[in-house]
Amino acid sequence: MSLKLDGKKLSLEIEKRLNDYISNNKIIAKRVPGLAVIRIGEDPASGVYVNNKEKACSRIGIKSFIFHLDESVEQKEVEQLIIKLNSDKDIDGMLLQLPIPKKFDEQKLISHINPSKDVDGLNEINIGKLVKNEPGMRSCTPAGIINLLRSQNITIEGKKIVVIGRSLLVGKPLSLMLLNLNGTVTMTHSKTLNLNKVCREADILIAAAGKPNLIDSSFVKEGAVIIDVGIHRLKSSDKNQTRLCGDVLLEDVISKVFAYTPVPGGVGPMTVTMLLVNTIFSWQKQFGLSSTLNDLLP
């Protein structure tokens, strides 16, 4: 039977440890950690994600600051808000909820976030630190994936790992993080020739293509580990209902794989948990708190 990499279960276990960590250190710091989330416009999915982050913060004792801006706001006004939050001593972490309306220069806004508060790990300073394998904020989804693998003692070093997707949010930082852990990494994308043949070489296959049910059994070798980053809402046979699925056609591959992540309940919960970890990491550094935070992770 294939091993289910249960991100929801692991995230709750880590959240309990994070809650204890905050409780044990907030008297020394004289405040709890603070996370600022900037949302622009009315994208429905963004509303759900921001709500999930706010709830997660509440569960473990992080104070959240939600700034919901109208789409009519100007680029300069958002930049000024970010600069103001950079100097706010009650805020340890900050993120710009993506996607944002196309009229904004996304990367310029992110570049204004203080690297020590950049809990999404998207500021060019943190990306540069990742490339150089120096300590810094790491992107949440890649970090969540690595901790999922570690939680089940799945070895990265020396393994052939294929990453499908080259986004700045997942594919690129994940490939670098795996490379830094001595994985043998192949990054693929929509223009890769013979994609299924390349994927069949993988000991660990990570699907972040953004295409529902792309990966079937022809992409997967016997005994592989498969990580599904995709999440899509499709119409079910009952036209009034929808269902969630990933990039992987799970029912077609499950008999071949050693381990897999479900959708939902796999990578998604761990992404939010690593956001909490990054926020607490920034808080910890600011106050010189106990450096046992890494001991709370797999």
From Swiss-Prot:
Any one GO CC term of the record: cytosol
Residues holding NADP(+): 165-167, 190, 231
Keywords of this entry: Amino-acid biosynthesis, Histidine biosynthesis, Hydrolase, Methionine biosynthesis, Multifunctional enzyme, NADP, One-carbon metabolism, Oxidoreductase, Purine biosynthesis
Pathway membership: One-carbon metabolism; tetrahydrofolate interconversion
Gene Ontology process terms (BP): L-histidine biosynthetic process; methionine biosynthetic process; purine nucleotide biosynthetic process; tetrahydrofolate interconversion
Subunit structure: Homodimer.
Name this protein carries in UniProt: Bifunctional protein FolD
